[in-house]
Curated annotation (Swiss-Prot):
Residue ranges of the TM segments: none
Domain of life: Bacteria
Family: Belongs to the iron/manganese superoxide dismutase family.
Note accompanying the cofactor annotation: Binds 1 Fe(2+) or Zn(2+) ion per subunit.
Catalytic reaction annotation: 2 superoxide + 2 H(+) = H2O2 + O2
Biological role: Destroys superoxide anion radicals which are normally produced within the cells and which are toxic to biological systems.
Assembly and binders: Tetramer.
GO molecular function: metal ion binding; superoxide dismutase activity
Cofactors named for this entry: Fe(2+); Zn(2+)
Protein name: Superoxide dismutase [Fe-Zn]
Residue ranges the record marks as coiled coil: none
Keywords: Iron, Metal-binding, Oxidoreductase, Zinc
UniProt-listed Enzyme Commission number(s): 1.15.1.1
Length: 15
């Protein structure tokens, strides 16, 4: 993902 999110698996939510 290309957004600043918490640790994975949240990275997939950064669509």
């Amino acid at each position: 993902a290309t957004y600043t999110l918490p640790e994975p698996p949240y990275d997939y939510a950064a669509l």
